[in-house]
């Protein structure tokens, strides 16, 4: 799959207006026939120039307007249909030049605003729309063959007062001087407009353009030293223009920057100020297309907003499939982490985390209340590389669109020179896993369900820490819905996501999205005689007839175990429904085998009823070997799961 760049318009529509007799029709006919017409009709018919004969390779329609044959109402319609309007004046007629400001520009503004008023609901919206969406204008001085002076000084003064004027050109329909250039400027005003990039009266970049270029600079600064060295500049050049930067040209560019911006070059590398100056210079010299090529390569549209197609390419996810990070996606995220881990301590401090997402509109999560409490961290409470990848794995499973969006913000498309789809792996459908009796996925979701006070939140948080004793007696004030970490299942790393299902009242029904998962963990407090009844009812109502593996867990097993006030005791209940015996869990005494068992159950979804394990022992043996051929022959699923009784009592 090739690189993705935001596309420009598929066609351009140019409208020519101006006073009678200034030569609008002659300009069109001279362009088409490449000779001056002896007889000129009142108005030329609309013509379309094929893409292969235009400099920008875009089909272009040229429309003539005649006040003799057409009405002002027709003019209004044509103005709104046009992408750019060329106001033609005669260089030997001062009145036609004066009427640019007294008649034509106010008229075009009024026609555009009339359309915007119909779409805007408030006066403020109308004013804002009128300022931001004015029709691009090109001023065309015809009949330059009749004078020996230029009108450019007068025209430049007009341009300062009307920012929608993109460019101006003097030409002659009779001698064909600058005829092609005139229509090229008109195309350019549509495809590579100046106004979104540059404030003419201030001679500087617009805030939106500057913000976009700052983001691009940061993304291209792959070593994070706030400079673009020769390697980074060459990579930037290849990604944007598909060609290397010749050493001589690179030296010349640096010399120009050094001459004009004293601190634009540092240690023979380009600073941010130098980078911004370079693009300002491109625009001042009429090379808008260079800056636009860069912006579009990095996902920006004509309004300097990130294009939705760039952020969210269509991704087909069949029913029963899930989404994971591909190897390339993980590799890219590792490189981003290492770039911003300035002190190389293997973790992101709050400040480093903030700097990392400075190229995004905002962070995808809260550092203090989300990522630090949903994935592994170090002793300082900072997110480790492992935790960083875990959090992205979590987001990719539950909100893959958001993952793609933030990968785009961070520059995946450019660094990997590919579509965002290359960062995502869509797993096969779950029904196929069941049919093949083995799952090839590496990320599983476990719903932890139980009554309030059962200890399910502590069970989830215990998955993130090496020493669970640290959590004893701790109040969990922040309600973190998901916790994610990795476990080894037959020598392969699997990510397990624990979702803490918040149940306010015992009689509240569970929603389908709260029930459906890869494995369910039903939690009761073994020291509370009324706790198991809720778990039993949940199982019978939602899971008894489903294909979802279920493990029943009794927490707080370090306390006195109480007989449950239910028809059956937990062990009897599990035996009746052919489930593994209850796994007794305690933050004080338990190790982490519970999480490995849950992941293993998710990896082998066909073994839902573990009372049938003896019948499936040969199959289980093969499945274990198929999941990880390098695993010792004695390690099979049966050993992992059936040992629940010995480990949990």
UniProtKB/Swiss-Prot annotation:
Q: Which Enzyme Commission numbers does its entry carry?
A: 3.6.5.-
Domain EF-hand spans what residues?
208-243, 328-363
What is the membrane topology noted in the UniProt record heading this document? Answer: Single-pass type IV membrane protein
Q: Which UniProt keywords apply?
A: Calcium, GTP-binding, Hydrolase, Membrane, Metal-binding, Mitochondrion, Mitochondrion outer membrane, Nucleotide-binding, Repeat, Transmembrane, Transmembrane helix
GO annotations of cellular component type: mitochondrial outer membrane
The UniProt record gives the binding positions of GTP 1 as: 18-25, 64-68, 142-145
> Per its UniProt entry, what is the enzyme's top EC class, as one word?
hydrolase
Q: Does the keyword GTP-binding apply?
A: yes
Q: Where is the Miro domain?
A: 9-192, 441-604
- Family per record: Belongs to the mitochondrial Rho GTPase family.
UniProt function note: Mitochondrial GTPase involved in mitochondrial trafficking. Probably involved in control of anterograde transport of mitochondria and their subcellular distribution.
What is the name of this protein?
A: Mitochondrial Rho GTPase
Q: Which organism is it from?
A: Drosophila pseudoobscura pseudoobscura
